[in-house]
Design a protein with these regions (language model features):
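A short core secondary-structure module
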Residues: 15-65
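Short loop segments at secondary-structure junctions
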Residues: 8-10, 35-39, 53-56, 88-95
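Residues that flank catalytic or metal-binding motifs in active/ligand-binding sites
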Residues: 1, 28, 45, 81-83
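A generic structural signal for beta-strand entry/edge sites
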Residues: 9-13, 29, 82
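A structural signal for short hydrophobic beta-strand segments in well-ordered beta-sheet cores
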Residues: 3-6
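Glycine-rich beta->alpha junctions and the first turn(s) of the following alpha-helix
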Residues: 65-167
């Protein structure tokens, strides 16, 4: 993690990058994990900040000084926009430090990861399901030797394996 936060009077100055911020352009507040404890290289030097920002628009997503970025093209995130951000001296007030104590950011982050992993699994199952639907339709529509290719054992077997794998993934996601 290369993003850093340093204290400057009553503010934190944040520099570095962050990737995978959902709805970053429109949000009023975002979480930022940054190294704030000087001389550390492991998780103990990381702190979490609740950084306020001015909501942007599609044309001008980031208007605050010290903050820029762009949208990331992603698969299966319909209706959710993901961004990569660059912090170039973005200011956050002293009370933006989540929990008020430096070095707790990694622990705070890990408490949120489990839910995010389940959400990612659910999204992947949805993408797989749609891919299977399209594959079935293609196998029905595509003719070879006067018949739909779904009638060929190798094609039917591959489609059956895809369905089996997707159902297993779905059930594991439900159980998570």
């Amino acid at each position: 993690l290369r993003t850093k936060a340093r204290k400057d009077g009553d503010d934190w100055i944040i520099t570095g990058n962050k990737t995978w911020i959902t709805h970053a352009a429109r949000t009023h507040v975002m979480t930022v994990l940054a190294r704030s404890v000087e001389g550390t290289t492991d998780y103990r030097g990381l702190s979490m900040f609740l950084a306020e920002k001015t909501p942007g628009t599609d044309a001008t997503p980031f208007v605050d000084q010290g903050l820029s970025g762009g949208e990331i093209e992603v698969l299966g995130y319909r209706g959710m926009r993901e961004y990569a951000l660059q912090f170039d001296g973005m200011k956050a007030p002293a009370d933006a430090l989540l929990g008020g104590e430096e070095g707790q950011g990694f622990k705070q982050l890990m408490r949120t990861v489990e839910g995010a992993r389940i959400q990612t699994a659910a999204r992947a199952v949805g993408v797989a399901r749609r891919a299977i639907e399209l594959a079935f339709q293609y196998a029905l529509d595509r003719k070879q030797f006067g018949q739909s290719i779904i009638r060929f054992p190798r094609v039917a077997d591959k489609l059956a394996k895809m369905v089996t794998d997707m159902v297993m993934a779905r059930e594991l996601t439900y159980a998570a």
